[in-house]
Regions:
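Short internal beta-strands
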Residues: 59-62, 177-179, 282-288, 350-353
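Core catalytic architecture of nucleotide-activated donor-dependent transferases building glycoconjugates
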Residues: 219-248, 254-309, 390-394, 398-415
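N-terminal mitochondrial targeting presequence
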Residues: 1-29
């Protein structure tokens, strides 16, 4: 009698679901983003999540501070202390809404965004772990540090916590820290020279980056080739007919490390008028941080020029279209995010006002100039000249390091 040959049991190559092949609890398929309400910080988190393939599988939470009136003077406090103090002040005086209305302040509606609550996020991570696997937590901004570190402390077996920007606390409170190199400027010889000896022990960071720190050149963001292709298509009708070269001007606002006012506005408008002959079109955008005195000067000097269009701030925001269709960029030196996005396109980027920057901002601009990524805007340029460089690719490189860190833990992201 001939033996009966039974079929071999199925193997992974025969279509076993990936989650079982890798282990039931080792695949990350969702993320939580913890923001602070500032576009520059939240954009970095969403950009990383997008690069990791979880753009459609993340939930945004926010750590919100009271705003308006005396609250603008209390931002140096830890957010929990600030909220308690604001509550006491409101109970004592009871007229905060009337005061805001009298000053013309509009309430900020965040009803569509969840308030970041450590207990809620930890409970969700624990209770859904067996069904949905580990939870990726990505946070950015000073107010998110205590929230993100508490989540890791309370649910370390169920979460992987990434903090973007140096948290100025012990880095072992997070699984991974992604921060620009210029955050370590205080440890450089140039930085040390600018710090009095008695203050050096108090200036953070105090130690060089260790193995779970990812260093970037600039800020993370959502701009990649796919985003640019999509924006080019969406804005084709508006930008394709414009005379070339199209020069996009992005104006930010002064910061603690980059102070300026009407002086920079006058410098910028003078330089733009000088290069106008070599421009086909100029598109100018202001940010929410742009002081009115700056925007007024620019509008007065350039608003009636037929080659110039100034965005009025109404939706839709043309920013993505600008990145896709511009032939060159002029960006104020204060905005690391805007400069990083422009430098991800490989197109000419000119920076105005870098000489007004101090501290770590000088290190950032120096690194870009040394790489040939940016040039100073002097007003003597021929804007039709095209030059290029290897585009900054910080977001993709940071995402790759996240993959590596997860693999060391035996986890991985959904394919």
């Amino acid at each position: 009698m001939r033996p009966i040959r039974l079929p071999e049991p199925p193997t992974q190559t025969m279509g076993v679901p990936e989650i079982f092949a890798a282990g039931a609890y080792s695949v990350i398929r969702r993320a939580v983003v913890i923001g602070n309400g500032y576009p520059g910080s939240e954009n970095q988190c969403v950009g990383l999540v997008r690069a990791l393939g979880l753009s459609d599988k993340h939930v945004l939470y926010r750590v919100t501070r009271p705003r308006g009136g005396i609250n603008e003077w209390l931002h140096w406090l830890p957010v929990s202390v600030h909220k308690k103090l604001e509550y006491v002040i409101r109970q004592i005086f009871g007229y905060s809404r009337l005061l805001s209305a009298a000053r013309g302040e509009k309430p900020v509606c965040l009803s569509s965004v969840l308030e970041a609550d450590v207990r809620q996020i930890v409970t969700m991570a624990r209770e859904t772990y067996e069904k949905d696997g580990p939870l990726l937590v990505v946070a950015s901004g000073r107010d998110t540090i205590s929230i993100a570190s508490s989540i890791k402390r309370l649910a370390s077996d169920n979460v992987f916590v990434v903090q973007i920007q140096h948290p100025r606390v012990h880095l072992n409170r997070f699984d991974l820290v992604i921060t620009p190199r210029h955050d370590y400027y205080p440890l450089t010889p140039e930085g040390q020279e600018k710090i009095p000896q008695f203050l050096r022990r108090w200036i953070t960071p105090c130690e060089p980056p260790d193995g779970h720190v990812v260093l970037t050149t600039g800020a993370l963001h959502q701009i990649d080739s796919a985003a640019l292709r999509s924006a080019a298509s969406a804005w084709h009708e508006e930008f394709a007919p414009l005379p070339k070269p199209l020069v996009v001007v992005n104006v930010g606002g002064p910061t603690g490390c980059c102070r300026y006012g009407s002086d920079l506005a006058k410098q910028l408008t003078a330089h733009l008028l000088n290069v106008l002959v070599s421009c086909g079109s100029i598109r100018i955008s202001f940010s929410m941080r742009t002081p009115e005195k700056v925007s007024k000067i620019i509008i007065k000097e350039l608003g009636n020029n037929p080659k110039v269009h100034i965005w009025d701030g109404e939706e839709p925001n043309p920013h993505l279209g600008h990145l896709a269709w511009a032939d060159a960029f002029v960006v104020t030196a204060d905005s690391i995010s805007l400069i990083s996005e422009a430098c991800s396109t490989g197109k000419p980027v000119y920076v105005v006002g870098a000489e007004r920057c101090t501290w770590k901002f000088t290190d950032f601009h120096k690194s870009l100039r040394e790489r040939g990524v940016v040039r100073p805007f002097t007003g003597s340029e021929d804007m039709s000249d095209s030059w290029s460089y290897p585009p900054l690719n910080d977001t993709a490189e940071a995402a790759s390091r996240v993959h590596e860190a997860l693999a060391e833990r035996g986890w991985k992201l959904r394919p």
